Each structure stands twice: as C-alpha cells, then as structure tokens.
Amino acid sequence: MIVINMFSSANKVAGQGVGAVYTELMGLLKHDFANEFQINVNRYTRSDISHYHTIDPKFYLSTFSKKRGRKIGFVHFVPSTLDASLKLPRVARWTLDRYTLAFYKRMDELVVVNPNFIPKLEAYGINPDKVTYIPNFVSQRTFHPVSREKRQALRHANGFKPDDFVVFGAGQVQDRKGVGDFIKLAQQNPDYRFVWAGGFSFGRITEGYERLKKAVANAPANLNFTGIMPRETMIDYYNMADLFLLPSFEELFPMSVLEAFATDTPVMVRDLELYQQIITPYTITAVDVADMQARIRALADDRELLATYAAKSH
C-alpha cells in the first residue's frame, strides 16, 4: 500500500476554494481508493509521497527531510494572482512572493488546476516538465440537483416566491471576484433577486476591504450577502437559483462553478481566456457588466433558453 502524507491547513480559513479542493480530494481518496493508499494528514512520519496543499512554513521545513518521499505540491496561486486579493506592505508582499516560489521549487512535481498556469510558472523559473494539469472536481454525492418539490420548499423557506428570478453568486468578497459588478446588476434589476454567499475570509488585508465592506452594508434591498456559508448549505442555494453568476476578473478553476454544474444550474461567467480550455463550452459568457445585463434579461424572459444551459451544465 502506498503511504501518502497530506500536508494542509486549507480548512483553517473558511470560505475559500482551497479548502473545498482539499475536501473533495480527501473524500475521493478515502471513498474510492481506501485499499490502495494509506492517507495520513499533517504527520511527519516516513511516506512514499508527500502532498502539499498549503505553503505553511513548517511544511516548507519538512521538505528537507529524507522521510518525505516524492514531494508533490498543489499550486493554488502564483504571486501575480495575489495582486487583486491581498493588500500587504511592500516588504511583506516581496517576502511572500519569494517564499511562495521557493516552496514550489522544493517540489519534485507540481499540480495546477488550470493549464494557463504552466507558462506562468515557467516564467518564474520552474521547469514546465514537472508541472501537470489536473482539473478540480466535485463529487455528486455532495452536490446534486433536488426534486422540483424540494426546490420549491427551499425557495419558500428562504423567502423566495415561486416566480422570483434568483441570481446566485459565491466566493470571497474581493474586487477580483467582480462583486462590484454583481451589486451593479442587482441595482439595475430590482425585480430580480440576487444572493451572494461569501465574506471577507482574510479580513482587513483583503484588497479594497473598507470600500467593499461599505458596499456590502449598503447593498440594494433585492441583494442579500449571506456571509461565509458551510458547503452543506451551499447546495440549497444552487438548487434555489435560476442562474449562477460568477463575474470574476481573475480565477484559476473555480469550485463554485463546478458545484453549480453538479446541481444542473445554468452558469454565467465573464469571458476570460483562462476559462477557454476548461469550462467555456458549458457556460454563458459575457464580456462586461452590460453584456451580463442583456443576457440575464434574455434568460429571465426565455425559460427554454435557461433550460438549454441547465442541460449543458450537467
């Protein structure tokens, strides 16, 4: 039996995709490969494979041990992706960038969830031959469609009328997630209901924290910011929604889109190059907020078109 030591603190910070990715992978290994792999978590005993999901300093130090076996690192971000996420003092940011790359360079193999990251890593001096693209995934044991009756019951319990057009979005409240555009769309469509699940996972160091906090506090009446929500509850919101909208300006391979797909919910995203190889064929794409507005209106007025995209998401 192959011994794998998983190293992760992904679930210490609630409401971020890294934790969802880790949870799904652990569920898959334990459910489908229990007789092939012995999985240890944050143990420093000898292993055949050490799989690093987060870049904690103590994990970095462990890479110098001969007990680690083959070292595999999960690339959830590169320095450039932090620009629109975190606001740090210049020295702290310089240190974090260099530490991140040093961690990745300690690995024997790296896993990326989007093939667009391979040339970015190469630009940072990492050999692309040791980088493998493995897409994220979501178990349909966790996320799945519900019956029409249960959907209506969920909508009633959460204050939605049967004929409400509900637009759902999810993710950390950050500029890069397009939260500002989500708010603007809610303002432009007072006859529709909008819900955003997610909060400030990194608190005050979130880029644009004060401005975004004020925007959330003054959201229009038809927009509800739920705050950080457990994944077990998220399935209800996907199933209540008529449309899942993720207006992000920058992503890797968003778990929220896969969760929406798993519940047969139509998905709209911003038209980004990084999506083209992974999810674009199955989504409604929009170039900007005006395009999103037009497409939302078209979908709300044409249930057959909405059903077409629901079928694509499956």
Question: What function would you assign to each model-found segment?
Answer:
Residues 91-110, 213:
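Membrane-proximal helix-turn-helix segments that form the acceptor-binding/catalytic region
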Residues 208-232:
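Nucleotide-activated donor-binding/catalytic signature segment of Leloir-type glycosyltransferases, i.e.
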Residues 193-210, 227:
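Glycosyltransferase donor-sugar binding loop
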Residues 249:
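Aromatic "clamp/platform" in nucleotide-sugar-dependent glycosyltransferases that forms part
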Residues 161-177, 183-187, 195:
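Conserved donor-binding/catalytic core segment of Leloir-type glycosyltransferases
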Residues 228, 236-241:
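Short alpha-helical donor nucleotide-sugar binding micro-motif in glycosyltransferases
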Residues 269, 280-291, 297-304:
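Conserved acidic donor-binding segment of nucleotide-sugar-dependent glycosyltransferases
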Residues 262, 266-269:
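Short hydrophobic beta-strand element within catalytic cores of glycosyltransferases
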